[in-house]
Amino acid sequence: SAGFYYTGQMESDARDLRVKMEWFWKSHAAATAVVLGSSRVLFGINASFIHSESVLNMGFPSGDIHAISFLTLNYVLKHMPKLKFAVLEFSPDFMWDKEALFWSPVYKKSPGFKYDKTHDFWKDSIPKGFVELVEESYKPIAEQTQPYSYDEFLMPSNGWGRATVVHDTMKYELDDDDVDYNMALYKFVINSLVEKGVQVILVVPPQNPGYAKTGAFGIYAGRRSHAEELLKRAAKLNAVMMDENKMGKHDYTSSMAYNTDHLSREGAKQLSERLDSLFVDLQK
C-alpha cells in the first residue's frame, strides 16, 4: 500500500490528488510556499507565473477545509523544512461542507493515506525508495475529454458564462454547527502553521461577477450577507487576507475565466502574479 494514493475505484477528484502527492514527495524539501484548497486554486494559481518563491500547489477538486487540514497537519508541517508561506483557499460557499461529503470518501478509499497514517506520516524519516513507489503507483492518464494536462493544470478561456446557482441559498443558515466547526478548523490549522514560523495567506478565488446581481455568493450558494459575515470572521484570523473575489467587484474579465467559478490560464496568470507580489511585500 505504500505510496498508493489512488486506485481505479476512487472518485475522479482523487486522480488530481494522486498527481499532487507525487509532486509533494519530489519537492517537499525545497519548496518555500504551498497552496492548499479546491480546484479553484488548483487552476487559479500556477507556479510557472511565480518567481519569488518555490511554490508547490497541492490544490485538487473538492479540497475543502477538511482536506486542507489533513494535508497541512500530516504532510506540510512534517515535511517542508524551508516553508515560508502557506496559501489556503477560503471560499465562503464551502463553509457548510461536512467532512463526510468529500474528504472522508477519498481518505477511506486510499491505501496510501492509511498506510502513511500507520507510520505516523513518516515524521521521523522517509523510507528509502518511497518516492519511487509513489511514482510507480497507479497513475491516471489525462483523459482527452478533460481540458487540462497533469503537467501544468491550466484551463482554456471559455468565459464566465451564466451565474448559475446549484443549491437553494435559503437552505443554509449562518448559525450552523458545520460552519462553526469549519471556522474553528481554519483557526487551528492557521495557528499550527504560524507556530512553526509560517506566514499564512487566505485567498478568496474570484467567481463570476454576475453573482453580485443574485442573492447567492457563488455557484454553491450561501447567501451574500452570510458570505460577508464569514469573510469578516476570516479576516480576524492570524492570516493575511487576499480577497480576489471582492463580492463580485473584481477585475477578472470573462477571457480570464474557464467557467463560472474557475479561472483560465489568463486568469491564473493575473492571480499568480499578484500572489508573487504579495510574497515579496510580506518579506520587506
Question: Predicted regions: what is each one?
Answer:
Residues 190-218:
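Active-site segments of SGNH/GDSL-like serine hydrolases
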Residues 90, 99-199:
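Secreted/periplasmic serine-hydrolase-like ester/acetyl group-modifying domain
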Residues 69-73, 179-187, 220-230:
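Well-ordered, non-membrane alpha-helical segments in soluble/globular domains
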Residues 187-201, 230-241:
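A structural motif corresponding to the C-terminal end of an alpha-helix
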Residues 1-32:
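N-terminal secretory targeting modules
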Residues 209-243:
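Substrate-gating cap/lid alpha-helix
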